[in-house]
Swiss-Prot record:
The keyword Heme applies. Its main location: mitochondrion. It is a multi-pass membrane protein. CDD domains: cytochrome_b_C (cd00290), Cytochrome_b_N (cd00284). InterPro entries: Cyt_b/b6_C (IPR005798), Cyt_b/b6_C_sf (IPR036150), Cyt_b/b6_N (IPR005797), Cytb/b6-like_sf (IPR027387), Cytochrome_b (IPR030689), Cytochrome_b_C_euk/bac (IPR048260), Cytochrome_b_N_euk/bac (IPR048259), Di-haem_cyt_TM (IPR016174). Keywords: Electron transport, Heme, Iron, Membrane, Metal-binding, Mitochondrion, Mitochondrion inner membrane, Respiratory chain, Transmembrane, Transmembrane helix, Transport, Ubiquinone. The chain crosses the membrane at residues 33-53, 77-98, 113-133, 178-198, 226-246, 288-308, 320-340, 347-367. Component of the ubiquinol-cytochrome c reductase complex (complex III or cytochrome b-c1 complex) that is part of the mitochondrial respiratory chain. The b-c1 complex mediates electron transfer from ubiquinol to cytochrome c. Contributes to the generation of a proton gradient across the mitochondrial membrane that is then used for ATP synthesis. Heme 1 (or BL or b562) is low-potential and absorbs at about 562 nm, and heme 2 (or BH or b566) is high-potential and absorbs at about 566 nm. This is Cytochrome b. One of its GO terms (molecular function) is ubiquinol-cytochrome-c reductase activity. It comes from the Eukaryota. The gene is MT-CYB.
C-alpha cells in the first residue's frame, strides 16, 4: 500500500514541501531565516488576534484599551509585548534573509525574489499601521508625518492624503481604517509567502557555492527540519528574553503619552527597523526627492538581478564583492543610527554621505567590481 503521505491530496502538498523535498546538502544556517519568518508570522497573527479581542479602534478609547490589555487582561502584558517585540524579531529575520539573498545570489530566482520584495513592502506597511494603533504621541505624529509624504505627489497629492486620512487630519476614520488594514494584511502576507514558496520549489534552493546542487541532494526531513527547529528555539529564546527582561528596549517612551494633536514631540522618528529609510528620506532637502529616495531605497532590491554582472552567482569566491557587501551592511547600520539622531550638524552630512554611498554601492560600484573580478579570472 502506498503511503498516505504521498497520495492524499492535502498531505502530498505538505510532503513535497517539507518532508520529501530534495534540498542541497550544503546549505548553511543562513537558510534558516525563511522558516523563522514563517514562525514570526504565526506568532504575530496569533498574538494580534488575541490583542484585537480587547482593543478598540476609537481615538477616545484606543490608548486606554491598550492600557487595559496590559493591566487587566490575563497575561495581556505578555501578549502585547510578544506582539511588539515579535515585530522587531520579524524585521531582524527579514533583513538577514534579504542579506543572505544578496550575498549568495538567490535573486537570480526572479519570481521568488520579486514576490519577496513585494512581501517586504507588505510587512513594512503592516508594521507602520500597527505602530499607529496604540494612539500614543509617536503613533499619531508618525502617522501624520508619513502619510503627509504622499502630498509630494504632483497634482493628486493633497487629495490623496485627505482620502487616506478620511478627513482633514489624522483622526478617528484614519485609526479605524488602519486597524482594518493591519488586521487583513498579515493574511495576505501569509498567502504571498505560500506563492513565494511555490516559486522557490519550482527551482529548488540555492546554496552557498552558487553552483548547481542537482548531483547532491538530501531529503528536507529529518536533516533540515531538525536544523530549523534549532533556529526556532534560538528565536524564541531571544524573543522571550527581550519580552521578559526589557520589553521597552526597542520602543519609544513618547508612545506612553496619549496622542495630542496640539503638542509635537521633540524628535519624531519611526521604529528602529525603518530608521535607515527615514535617514535617506531626511537627507534630501526636497520633499518629492526625499519621497522618491525613500521608495527607491527598498524598490532598488527589485533591480538587483539586472545589476548582476558577475559570471559567478554567489559571492563565496569573490573577495572584492564580499568587502563591498560588508561596507553596504556597515552603511545601513550607519543610516539606522543617523535616522534616530536629531537633524543637526554633524548628523545631516553623515546621513547625506551614507545615503549617497548606499545608492552608489548598489548601482555603480558593485556591478563594476563584478566585471573587474571577471577580468581577473580571464572570463
Amino acid at each position: 500500500m502506498t503511503n498516505i503521505r504521498k497520495t492524499h491530496p492535502l498531505m502530498k502538498i505538505i510532503n513535497s514541501s517539507f518532508i520529501d523535498l530534495p534540498a542541497p546538502s550544503n546549505i548553511s544556517s543562513w537558510w534558516n531565516f525563511g522558516s523563522l519568518l514563517g514562525v514570526c508570522l504565526i506568532i504575530q497573527i496569533l498574538t494580534g488576534l488575541f490583542l484585537a479581542m480587547h482593543y478598540t479602534s476609537d481615538t477616545m478609547t484606543a490608548f486606554s484599551s491598550v492600557t487595559h490589555i496590559c493591566r487587566d487582561v490575563n497575561y495581556g502584558w505578555l501578549i502585547r509585548y510578544l506582539h511588539a517585540n515579535g515585530a522587531s524579531m520579524f524585521f531582524i529575520c527579514l533583513f538577514l534573509h534579504v542579506g543572505r539573498g544578496l550575498y549568495y545570489g538567490s535573486y537570480m530566482f526572479l519570481e521568488t525574489w520579486n514576490i519577496g520584495v513585494l512581501l517586504l513592502f507588505a510587512v513594512m506597511a503592516t508594521a507602520f499601521m500597527g505602530y499607529v494603533l496604540p494612539w500614543g504621541q509617536m503613533s499619531f505624529w508618525g502617522a501624520t508625518v508619513i502619510t503627509n509624504l504622499l502630498s509630494a505627489i504632483p497634482y493628486i497629492g493633497s487629495d490623496l492624503v485627505q482620502w487616506i486620512w478620511g478627513g482633514f487630519s489624522v483622526d478617528k476614520a484614519t485609526l479605524t481604517r488602519f486597524f482594518a488594514f493591519h488586521f487583513i494584511l498579515p493574511f495576505i502576507i501569509a498567502a504571498l509567502a505560500g506563492v513565494h514558496l511555490l516559486f522557490l520549489h519550482e527551482t529548488g534552493s540555492n546554496n552557498p557555492s552558487g553552483l548547481s546542487s542537482d548531483a547532491d541532494k538530501i531529503p528536507f526531513h529529518p536533516y533540515y527540519t531538525i536544523k530549523d527547529i534549532l533556529g526556532v528555539l534560538l528565536l524564541i529564546l531571544v524573543l522571550t528574553s527581550l519580552v521578559l527582561f526589557s520589553p521597552d528596549l526597542l520602543g519609544d517612551p513618547d508612545n506612553y503619552t496619549p496622542a495630542n494633536p496640539l503638542n509635537t514631540p521633540p524628535h519624531i522618528k519611526p521604529e528602529w527597523y525603518f530608521l535607515f529609510a527615514y535617514a535617506i528620506l531626511r537627507s534630501i532637502p526636497n520633499k518629492l526627492g526625499g519621497v522618491l529616495a525613500l521608495v527607491l531605497s527598498i524598490l532598488i532590491l527589485a533591480f538587483i538581478p539586472l545589476l548582476h554582472t558577475s559570471k559567478q552567482r554567489s559571492m563565496m569566491f569573490r573577495p572584492f564583492s564580499q568587502c563591498l557587501f560588508w561596507i553596504l551592511v556597515a552603511d545601513l547600520i550607519t543610516l539606522t543610527w543617523i535616522g534616530g539622531q536629531p537633524v543637526e550638524h554633524p548628523f545631516i552630512i553623515i546621513g547625506q554621505l551614507a545615503s549617497i554611498l548606499y545608492f552608489l554601492l548598489i548601482l555603480v560600484i558593485m556591478p563594476i567590481t563584478s566585471l573587474f573580478e571577471n577580468n581577473l579570472l580571464k572570463w
